[in-house]
Amino acid sequence: MSAPASLARARRRASAVRFWRAYRTHRAGLLGLAALTVIALVALAAPLLVGDDVQSVTRASGGPLEPPSAAFPLGTDQFGRDLLGLLVWGARISLLVGLLAAALSVAIGTLVGVIAGHYGGWFATALMRVTDWFLVMPTLVLAIVLATVMSRGVWTVVVAIGVTSWPTTARLVRAQTIAVESRPYIERARALGGGHGHIMNRHVLPNVMPLVLAQTTLGISAAILTEATLAFLGLGDPTVVSWGGMLQDAREAGAVSSGHWWYLAPPGLAIAAVALAFTLCGRAVESVLNPKLGAR
């Protein structure tokens, strides 16, 4: 390995160590990280913990809408399926959609923001006007429209959320890009013959990535809430179990009017808990990467 590569690797390792040391000082962030770790492990181990049969209607072992008991700690749904098992399986889809949708949203926003901030001129103005249009339009409404006109499925939900929630990231990244472009070493890079691609990849992107990381963490929380809303409205994938889909099934089963609280509470609390955990992590990351926020 060459000396420059070794030096760059050592710097990245030292930066990661400094980040973790600063992150550990945020108790709320640690609490959110611990909660997300447990939920992610449970979701990954769903086949081992509850098995595949829990999703089957024909092989349900309980009676319809049984209250919590020793056999069914969270009760059963209208088909007699164990709600605890469904909750565990639902975590997989809710987390997957949240992660993928947030990644797509941040990728689009970062691309638009870096290009607009670097090039400027009429092209940047046009990009920002498109961004402003998306900003003034309610994200949920646009996502509902896309999910309605496209075929129903997990990837449809991911795309519907990702392509409608990127404008905030684009605005933030553009502002950061303009700030980076004003620094002296950018002028030196241009004087030495650095092209647009070199400057954006070697100088701009590394400096905006901390902001992108914080925005991604916060975006996952919003994406999970949007996915739950779409599933609750019947626009999710009917072939998989998700927390939002469980809420929709509870509504269709009349759990609200009949007082079957155990059908509504688990998925609702799970959505709130995961959204809160990602928000706590995002705020902690934001505070570490931008110490001025922590002083407020």
Predicted regions mapped to residue ranges:
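Transmembrane alpha-helices
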Residues: 92-108, 197-229, 278
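Short helix-capping/hinge motifs at transmembrane helix termini and TM-loop junctions
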Residues: 46-54, 117-121, 146-152, 226, ...
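Hydrophobic core positions of alpha-helical segments in small-molecule transporters
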Residues: 31-35, 97-101, 127-130, 143, ...
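Alpha-helical transmembrane segments
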Residues: 166, 170, 223, 274-278
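Gly/Trp-centered helix-boundary motif
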Residues: 1-110, 114-115, 122-125, 140, ...
